[in-house]
């Protein structure tokens, strides 16, 4: 060890003496013998040290090893300040849905390093994607105190299948797309007779369209196949080194990613067994073996439960390197890393870092001096959750990496008591919610709450905010039952969690970028409000940008309101507006003029096509696992209850109302509403395309809008374009003819050859609709009816040179959750089949940290409650209750 001070303290030590959840900025501590220095002393010493780090050893000479390491240290220490990362968690009211339901959600946006509510981004994007990977609905939400909420309506365009809910802020896209929040929920066909014995029907065809990659299997990365099994080896530190001991995790699955039980044995070149281990949890295990001079001559055998034995290849061994063995935290809660190195590395000065979600917590130098060295550190030298220890050379070459877990602070506790253990039909439900130690959290506790009828749960619950932010976001692939790792703090659960980190560990931050060895490319800015930015191109095939252009924008809101703004493009042709906040859709009219104040043909591109590429579904997340319902007497007695006297009035007061004829806005009348307009097509179609959004994406990217049928054949693999004998093109659906209907038949004479002529497109394969539209006796020749709907909004503006007219989407206004009141305004009914009885995206507490919630059960004769609470406090403590 080469410490900065004589007492052997580390060069940098971050957050070691501070509680979890400090502000999102680095605080630099240098630990000295007489205690901690004052803030002014720390900053002064840090400035001197960082200045020293940039000074070469002598003029014209190469920097020393210490200089190079210190340069890495300084970049690591500043990384989280320069590139602060956010994380998102979305709490849903339910775990599965039926067509026609609403998906209610509450989103939490936090700093990744300390899990405090973000003060950076003010805009959040929440999207609903279908199995094809198409964005069915997109919400742009205003973030306040790290919170936002909304709902998706599963209308006629949302058919049964698996849907993905995705959420992100714009700066989150500067990193790997795997860091975007993503969750898959099943949507079942709504039964014709609700309340009858439940027969679930899920119509899924995940791989039928082109946009989303084929469904994936969460196999061990880097796995090798052995006798039909997939086996992955993961040496601690990242590599197998000749002449060094073996400490490795392994995982065994079948070809579909299902974990398997097996025993792994290692045999030396002379046939001696040098290691044996069995799988423990989810097909994962850990094996140790003494050092071997040549690991390529070691034979590995795997024996499954049926006694079948197959040979397995070990990873390629390296002649030079280091090996790390992490020992579980001891009684004194210290971290112990046993490091072994080959002779060539034992005298080198190396660097050691511990980072947690992009934040540097420990930086130091290390010199082995011997074949093995024990590195012992206090637990508070690490962050809370998944940490990464990295051992590296002065030139930035990583010798070894090891992910490990540090137990976080306890959750902020929330108590929920009920007035009854079970309820009758349409009866009042009263819950008392309280937060013990409310004053300790600064009276700033925010959480959302869902109450479901437990008997209506279809699948097992999804990961909560703790599993998502602390674990799943730092793990590669799909994690089955992440809540298991938090059920208990015993050795079995801790060992399973450590195996998971070794097997599925994923580096959410590129260490080379953190250390300043690779550039960090920032493509997306922080959105502190309604940002409208883009680039102006000259329209030529070279796509040259237009610097020093003046640009004005006119935002036309519903009614007579308008917002106006002006700006100029920079030297690269880029522009940006910070528009006042508005809600709902609007039309934007952009007008550009060159430096001579003349209108010229140009392409005004907007930077709003932010959505990441659709990911592949994991096959494991498509396996529906029913919940484990426990209605035993012991379970009933565990439900916290309180005595309550029903004082709610039972007389229903009906207000006198005046019924008038319902009128319609005829602005978009005529052909646009003929036979119900788009609603008619939605009712009978199986596939819906938001063509208006697709057109905007082409224009935003500066590309020409394609032809209607050319685009459809590229978008949907069921369609093809055939060449007719006359040299024209003919659209076919799965080899059959297509009937095209424009505006439900009212737009027969309209030209729809260009995609920008349309607002939406729907594919109908309903036999009755085909029979009604097809010529007599020709139904068998027709593959589908293609409904095309033209766009009325684009026809109310005059298009001029140097202008672009486009839709602008404002913030999505939150909608209040509907819950009937059977004692005031509504009569009890036998057809109330609500599965979510209560949803509150932001429960308000009084000054004592308490709240009383009252609502009504559904029409089931006997029912129990399932309660879900997720949230956070202002100081970074998480809130999670699933009961």
For the regions a protein language model found, what residue spans apply to each?
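Surface-exposed, low-complexity/disordered segments
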Residues: 79-81, 98, 155-160, 169-247, ...
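Short beta-strand and strand-turn-strand segments in soluble, beta-rich domains
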Residues: 83-87, 128-137, 267-272, 355-361, ...
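A short tyrosine-centered beta-strand micro-motif
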Residues: 163-167, 296-298, 387-389, 586
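Internal, hydrophobic beta-strand segments that form the core of beta-sheet-rich folds
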Residues: 107, 164-171, 390, 868-872
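Ligand-binding face of N-terminal immunoglobulin V-set domains in extracellular IgSF glycoproteins
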Residues: 150-153
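Short beta-strand segments within Ig-like beta-sandwich modules, predominantly Fibronectin type-III
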Residues: 139-144, 276-281, 364-369, 565-570, ...
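Bacterial Sec-dependent N-terminal signal peptides
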Residues: 1, 5-72
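Contiguous segments within soluble domain cores/interaction surfaces
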Residues: 63-86, 91, 97-98, 102-142, ...
């Amino acid at each position: 060890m080469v410490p900065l001070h004589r007492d052997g303290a580390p060069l940098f030590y971050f957050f070691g003496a501070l509680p979890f959840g400090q502000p999102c900025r680095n605080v630099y501590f240098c630990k000295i013998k007489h205690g901690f220095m004052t803030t002014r002393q720390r900053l002064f010493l840090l400035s001197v040290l960082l200045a020293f780090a940039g000074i070469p050893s002598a003029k014209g000479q190469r920097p020393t090893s210490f200089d190079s390491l210190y340069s890495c240290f300084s970049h690591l220490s500043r990384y989280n300040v320069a590139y602060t990362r956010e994380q998102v968690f979305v709490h849903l009211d339910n775990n599965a849905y039926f067509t026609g339901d609403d998906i209610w959600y509450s989103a939490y946006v936090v700093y990744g390093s300390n899990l405090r509510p973000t003060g950076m981004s003010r805009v959040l994007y929440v999207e609903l994607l279908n199995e094809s990977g198409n964005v069915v609905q997109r919400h742009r939400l205003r973030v306040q105190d790290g919170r936002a909420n909304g709902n998706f309506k599963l209308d006629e365009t949302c058919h049964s299948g698996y849907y993905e809910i995705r959420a992100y802020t714009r700066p989150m896209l500067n990193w790997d797309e795997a860091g975007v929040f993503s969750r898959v929920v099943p949507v079942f066909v709504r039964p014709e007779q609700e309340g009858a014995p439940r027969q679930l029907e899920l119509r899924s065809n995940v791989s039928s369209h082109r946009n989303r990659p084929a469904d994936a299997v969460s196999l061990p990365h880097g796995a090798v196949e052995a006798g039909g099994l997939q086996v992955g080896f993961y040496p601690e530190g990242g590599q197998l080194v000749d002449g060094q001991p073996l400490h490795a995790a392994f995982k065994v699955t079948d070809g579909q990613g299902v974990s398997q039980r097996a025993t792994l044995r290692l045999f030396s070149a002379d046939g001696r067994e040098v290691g044996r281990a069995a799988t423990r949890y989810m097909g994962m295990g850990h094996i140790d073996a003494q050092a071997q001079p040549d690991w390529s001559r070691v034979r590995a055998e795997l024996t499954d439960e049926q006694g079948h034995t197959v040979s397995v290849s070990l990873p390629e061994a390296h002649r030079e390197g280091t090996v790390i063995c992490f020992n579980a935290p001891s009684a004194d809660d210290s971290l112990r890393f046993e490091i072994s190195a080959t002779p060539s590395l034992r005298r080198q000065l190396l660097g050691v870092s511990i980072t947690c979600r992009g934040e540097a917590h420990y930086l130091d130098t290390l010199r082995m001096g011997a074949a093995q060295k024990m590195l012992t550190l206090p637990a508070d030298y690490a962050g809370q959750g998944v940490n990464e220890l990295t051992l590296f050379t002065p030139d930035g070459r990583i010798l070894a990496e090891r992910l490990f877990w540090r137990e976080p602070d306890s959750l902020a506790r929330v108590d929920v008591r009920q007035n009854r253990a079970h309820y009758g039909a349409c009866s009042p439900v009263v819950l008392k919610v309280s937060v013990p130690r409310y004053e300790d959290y600064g009276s700033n506790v925010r959480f959302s709450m869902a109450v479901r009828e437990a008997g209506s749960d279809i699948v097992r619950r999804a990961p909560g905010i703790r599993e998502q932010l602390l674990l799943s976001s730092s793990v590669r692939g799909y994690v089955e039952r992440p809540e298991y790792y938090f059920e208990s703090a015993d050795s079995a659960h801790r060992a399973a969690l450590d195996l998971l980190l070794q097997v599925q560990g994923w580096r959410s931050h590129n260490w080379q970028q953190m250390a300043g060895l690779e550039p960090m490319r920032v493509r997306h800015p922080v959105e502190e409000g309604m940002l409208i930015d883009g680039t102006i191109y000259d329209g030529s095939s070279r796509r040259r940008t237009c610097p020093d252009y003046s640009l004005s924008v006119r935002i036309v809101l519903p009614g007579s309101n308008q917002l106006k703004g002006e700006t100029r493009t920079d030297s690269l042709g880029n522009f940006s507006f910070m528009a006042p906040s508005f809600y709902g859709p609007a039309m934007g009219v952009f007008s550009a003029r060159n430096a001579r104040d003349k209108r010229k043909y140009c392409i005004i591109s907007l930077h709003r096509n932010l959505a990441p590429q659709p990911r592949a579904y994991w096959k494991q997340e498509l396996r529906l696992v029913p919940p484990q319902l426990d209605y035993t007497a012991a379970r009933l007695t565990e439900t916290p209850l309180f005595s309550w006297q029903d004082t709610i009035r039972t007389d229903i007061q009906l207000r006198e109302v005046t019924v008038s004829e319902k009128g319609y806005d005829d602005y978009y009348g005529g052909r646009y509403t003929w036979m119900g307009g788009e609603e008619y097509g939605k009712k009978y179609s199986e596939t819906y395309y938001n063509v208006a959004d697709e057109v905007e994406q082409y224009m935003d990217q500066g590309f020409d809008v394609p032809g209607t049928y050319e685009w459809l054949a590229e978008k949907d693999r069921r369609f093809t374009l055939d060449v007719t004998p006359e040299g024209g093109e003919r659209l076919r659906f799965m080899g059959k003819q297509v009937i095209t209907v424009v505006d439900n038949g009212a737009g027969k004479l309209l030209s729809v050859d260009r995609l920008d002529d349309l607002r939406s497109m729907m594919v109908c394969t309903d036999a009755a609709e085909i029979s009604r539209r097809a010529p007599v006796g020709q139904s068998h020749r027709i593959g589908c009816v293609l409904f095309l709907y033209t766009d009325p909004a684009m026809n109310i503006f005059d298009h001029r040179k140097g202008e672009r007219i486009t839709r602008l989407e404002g913030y999505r206004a939150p909608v209040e959750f509907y819950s009937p009141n059977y004692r005031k305004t509504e009569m009890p009914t036998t057809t109330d089949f609500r599965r979510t009885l209560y949803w509150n995206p932001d429960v308000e507490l009084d000054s004592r940290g308490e709240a009383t919630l009252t609502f009504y059960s559904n029409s089931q004769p006997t029912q129990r409650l399932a309660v879900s609470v997720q949230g956070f406090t202002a100081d970074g403590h998480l809130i999670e209750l699933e009961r």
